[in-house]
Design a protein with these regions (language model features):
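Catalytic phosphate/metal-binding cores of nucleic-acid and nucleotide-processing enzymes, i.e., regions
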Residues: 1-129
């Protein structure tokens, strides 16, 4: 098994999408998320969480995003014992994302606990440049 760096969107993949009458502190994890992420982390994978929370309402101002939502998000991850190595705020808000290394998330049951059925990156990274 090759250890992978796995970058995972927060809302709609790890946490339920926030409803109009909720705050981000109120949302629940998606079924299977905690268990599967724990299994992936235990298998040695490097987990990166990426979120676009407040990017639209803050007009892309990442400093303002941090002030408004970072502590709430970090507390939520701790509350639900979500394992991760990095978290990145500032995913640009968009209607659709096109990426050559994307995996279309449907449900956590479709992902092996050790990550073996996740696609392998076909990009080769060159240092420098």
């Amino acid at each position: 098994m090759k250890i992978k760096r796995i970058c995972i969107d927060l809302d709609g993949v790890i946490s339920q999408l926030k409803k109009e009458n909720e705050t981000y502190a109120d949302v629940e994890p998606i079924a299977g998320a905690v268990e599967k992420l724990t299994s992936l982390k235990t298998s040695g994978h490097y987990i990166i969480i990426l979120t676009a929370r407040h990017m639209k309402t803050c007009n892309g101002n990442i400093g303002l995003v941090h002030r408004r939502i970072a502590n709430i998000t970090m507390d939520w991850l701790k509350k639900y014992k979500i394992p991760y190595d990095e978290i990145h705020f500032g995913k640009p808000w968009a209607d659709i994302y096109i990426d050559d290394n994307a995996y279309r998330f449907v449900e956590w049951e479709k992902i092996d606990g050790n990550g073996d059925n996740l696609p392998q990156s076909h990009e080769s990274q060159v240092r420098g440049g």
